Amino acid sequence: MTIETLLQNHPALIACRDSVESARDLLIDTYRAGGKLLLCGNGGSAADCDHIAGELLKGFLSHRPLSEEDCLALAESLPDGEADPDLYLLAGQLQGGLPAISLPAQTAALTAVCNDTDPALIFAQLTWALGQAEDTLVCLSTSGNSRNVVLAAKAAKTKGLRVLALTGENDSKLSELADVTVQVPATETYRVQEYHLPVYHYLCAAVEEEFFG
């Protein structure tokens, strides 16, 4: 999938081309540096976080077969070596992955924060605990002003992470904080989310192409 394909299928996103390309470059730089993605959002955007992580952790548009080096390492590490009955399954079906963590999926930790400190800190606490300087926090908020997401962005910046925001078209607290903001051309929640989907599908495809061909 190319940027041209994205814009041909969704002409309204032409105005976002520069920011989408900057987002792509940011994600590629993150993975080149050995970093990971942390993703946060509420409601439908929380589901989008799970969706994005799913596209990155395994094959999306390509199969991402293991390298010969990885297959050899498997054979050498299994108890029965090449005779191990699980070698064929592991070497043949495991896929290359790109590390991404959906923070809304961390139910036990989120509810602990809600119960023990402040519900507004659910994503900030996990970002603080999991984030490293080479990582990027991806914030999805249709308004760009969701308090728990904004607090996570502030925590991320303090720890040296970069921040990518996907929002609606209006300037927002997230657009002030983020290194890159993709402001899709809509304000209604469902319309913003409908634009976010093709944007992040393109980003996942572009990152996959960069690292797995």
Regions found by a protein language model. Give the residues of each.
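Generic N-terminal amphipathic, Lys/Arg-enriched alpha-helix
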Residues: M1-A15
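Short beta->alpha connector loops at strand-helix junctions that form conserved
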Residues: A124, S141, T167, V182-Y190
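Short, glycine/polar-rich helix-capping loops at beta-to-alpha or helix-loop-helix junctions
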Residues: A165-A178
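Glycine-rich, small/polar surface segments that engage phosphate groups of diverse ligands
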Residues: T30-L130
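Glycine-centered short loops/turns at secondary-structure junctions
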Residues: G34-G35, E134, G160
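A charged, well-structured terminal subsegment
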Residues: A129, V192-G213
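A short, well-structured juxtamembrane/interface segment
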Residues: A15-A33
